[in-house]
């Protein structure tokens, strides 16, 4: 593979994460305006965004098999067509059914693109370099999560219709579409070059189960925590502005942490540092949940920084459980994480209703403790060390 081709594929991976981050995180900014547009209360409007999450989940799950049937370049180009149709649907429709359909299509497109982006990184880079590259790729999710809400605020403050926010997000996919030209993608399944040697099917092993549970619990814990921090902070007498600043600080620190760990991870065994980070994150979340408002700002900054590398390292270790990176395995771990996203309000909503926001934060803390236990147990069964040794010879 030529260096320029590798750079193009790497940028497609970066932008695939930026696309998903923009779509998921911008929701809170535009929900009120969309509710006004359809003359609906915000509470019933929020349910339609489940179609976005459902699209992401279904496409990540199915793409484990689709990748071996439909070439990656074809998928990305077809995704561009779907993106144009979805944004056009948002712009020219006043029907809630069509809005929900467009949201589902956007979810499908971003899920397919993100799973391709993840697979490209696991295919092109080996060992510890794979971990640091995946981490840097994941930082584009957070970066888009910071940039696009600012773009949305700028447009909405000038009374520009909400659907132009999605048109701006569509520009990310225009860049991906342009990068597919003159770019060679890895061939999979029936499109892969034929070899005389029989294809050896590798068993995944119990380590994949530990990593999948860790991925689900981590995302469910993280989103369950950050979704209820503002309500919890307001209950302690903080202003809405200060409560919002806590969330912003978390994501800012999370992004800085990703950049720092994309360098730091190269010097450590991934399973060991993952266990340390998961334990630290569980302790820091407990400090936040039981501390005074005066210490909240510092503890959430520390939590954002030290938890930033956990999810990506889980995916990296998953990809290293087999000798050759398996798209089905990587997508399975990703799917478990996405299920965590889907369950966020299903799990935390009733807890808050019965016991208040702090109970939801303590539940999230318990989930982080489960992540620590899974990472610790992984140390006894993980195959990443033997596969790293093989690839380094």
From Swiss-Prot:
- List the GO molecular function terms: transmembrane transporter activity
Q: List the Gene3D superfamilies.
A: MFS general substrate transporter like domains
Per the record, membrane topology reads: Multi-pass membrane protein
Looking up CDD domains in the UniProt record yields:
MFS_FucP_MFSD4_like
The superkingdom listed in its UniProt entry is Bacteria
Q: Which residues cross the membrane?
A: 11-31, 51-71, 78-98, 101-121, 134-154, 162-182, 206-226, 245-265, 273-293, 297-317, 332-352, 361-381
Family assignment from sequence similarity = Belongs to the major facilitator superfamily. TsgA family.
The name on file for this protein is Protein TsgA
State the organism named in the record. Answer: Shigella sonnei (strain Ss046)
Lineage from the top down? Bacteria, Pseudomonadati, Pseudomonadota, Gammaproteobacteria, Enterobacterales
């Amino acid at each position: 593979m030529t260096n320029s081709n590798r750079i193009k594929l790497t940028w497609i991976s970066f932008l695939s994460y930026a696309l998903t981050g923009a779509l998921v995180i911008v929701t809170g900014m535009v929900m009120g305006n969309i509710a006004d547009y359809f003359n609906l209360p915000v509470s019933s409007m929020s349910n339609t965004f489940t179609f976005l999450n459902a699209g992401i989940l279904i496409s990540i799950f199915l793409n484990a098999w689709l990748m071996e049937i439909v070439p990656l370049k074809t998928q990305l180009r077809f995704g561009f067509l779907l993106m144009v149709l979805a944004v056009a649907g948002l712009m020219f429709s006043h029907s809630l059914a069509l809005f929900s359909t467009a949201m589902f299509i956007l979810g499908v497109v971003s899920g397919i693109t993100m799973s391709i982006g993840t697979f490209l990184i696991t295919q092109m880079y080996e060992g510890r370099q794979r971990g640091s590259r995946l981490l840097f790729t994941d930082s584009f999710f957070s970066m888009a999560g910071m940039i696009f809400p600012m773009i949305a605020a700028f447009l909405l403050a000038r009374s520009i219709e909400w659907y132009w926010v999605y048109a701006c997000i569509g520009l990310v996919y225009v860049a991906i579409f342009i990068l597919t030209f003159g770019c060679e993608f890895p061939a999979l399944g029936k499109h892969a070059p034929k070899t005389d040697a029989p294809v050896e099917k590798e068993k995944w092993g119990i380590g994949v189960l530990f990593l999948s549970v860790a991925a689900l619990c981590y995302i469910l814990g993280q989103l369950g925590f950050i979704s209820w921090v503002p309500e919890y902070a307001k209950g302690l007498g903080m202003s809405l502005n200060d409560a919002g600043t806590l969330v912003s600080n978390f994501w800012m620190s999370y992004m800085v942490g990703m950049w720092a760990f994309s360098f730091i991870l190269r010097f450590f065994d991934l399973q060991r540092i993952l266990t340390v980070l998961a334990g630290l994150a569980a302790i820091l979340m407990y400090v936040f949940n039981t501390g005074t408002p005066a210490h909240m700002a510092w503890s959430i900054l520390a939590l954002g920084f030290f938890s930033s590398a956990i999810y990506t390292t889980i995916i990296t270790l998953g990809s290293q459980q087999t000798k050759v990176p398996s798209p089905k395995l990587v997508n399975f771990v990703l799917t478990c994480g996405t299920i965590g996203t889907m369950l966020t309000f299903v799990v935390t909503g009733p807890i808050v209703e019965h016991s208040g926001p702090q109970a939801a934060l303590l539940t999230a803390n318990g989930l982080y403790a489960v992540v620590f236990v899974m990472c610790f147990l992984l140390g006894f069964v993980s195959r990443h060390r033997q596969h790293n040794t093989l690839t380094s010879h």
